[in-house]
Amino acid sequence: TETIPAVFRLLTNKEVALPPFSATSTLPSLMNGGKDFSPWSKKDDLLYNTIRGPVMAVLGRDGVGLPDCALAESKFEKGENISGRMLTIISRMSELRNNGTPDMEFAVSGLLARSQLAGGRGEDARRTVLALREQFEERGLTRFFPNMDAMLCRIDLHTGQLDRADEWYRAKAPRDPIHLNVMKRYQYFTQAMVEIADGQPDAALMTLSPLGPYIKTCGRYIDGIHLHILTALALHRSKAEGWQTHLTEALDTAAEFRFIRTVSVYGTAVLPLLEKLEWSKDAKWKNQLMADVRAQAAYYPLFLQPRLPPGEELTPTERQILYLLCADKSNAEIARIMDSKLPTVKTHVS
């Protein structure tokens, strides 16, 4: 909290000049962009109120919209409803576009898309990203496309558009575990998700493995949560030991920062593992987490689930029952909601 005001004074007195930089590294995130700001999120309100002005003054164009977006993303990761915050930020998009940077535009649109996805509005999330992609294409900002396309792939995985996800995997996934490029880590994680969804857990483990040392050395807490959850999923799918250790590591880190959506975004994929795991370090946080995980599972019951063989796709009735099961409804409750007989529901569930 003392560094930013000090730099502000130096800049004001023209004693130092800042070189250009990217707060996001072309990622759709400020909290987990060029730097991991998880430690800051523990005091997000205090920091916002005390250094918002100096940050914007110090960073110039790079600071336009940054404090508000960073605070909103911190609250989002903690499971809060950020609809009101997003309305305020979106109302200033013209100012951001004219006076800020495309990095911040992507961070804001990325956060909007993630909040839409978390609210069960997957198609809205896809439209948000596609709209920005079209604008960036007109402005020649193609450097954002690799991570933007990876984000679209993640949305496709949530909404069951597996053919589109596979198309991204074939044409755009890095698929080179030997030569790690940490700037592509968002794409590596997306690649691992597709591999898990396609029933290739061993390939996912190969994709994820090189990221471990970098994430640990550089203190990438959010990336670490994703790494451990995806590793746990891949190990569990391959019926290997050790998934409990990785999931415990992810929960320990998430609980430290009070993060909810970093874990709950995996919804129906991680739900059975969470129900099996004995973890009781913070009951209140765990209850909040499980509620959000079940909500995501209900919105996207096929996320990262093995692809069904041709001819075995779920019927609309089966999809509705799966949706309600993920919402933690009992067979009797499902029967009442669907105006069906209990034995009929039990037949579908079995």
Give the location of each predicted region.
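Helix-turn-helix repeat elements of alpha-solenoid scaffolds
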Residues: T1-N13, A23-R52, F76-R92, A118-A131, ...
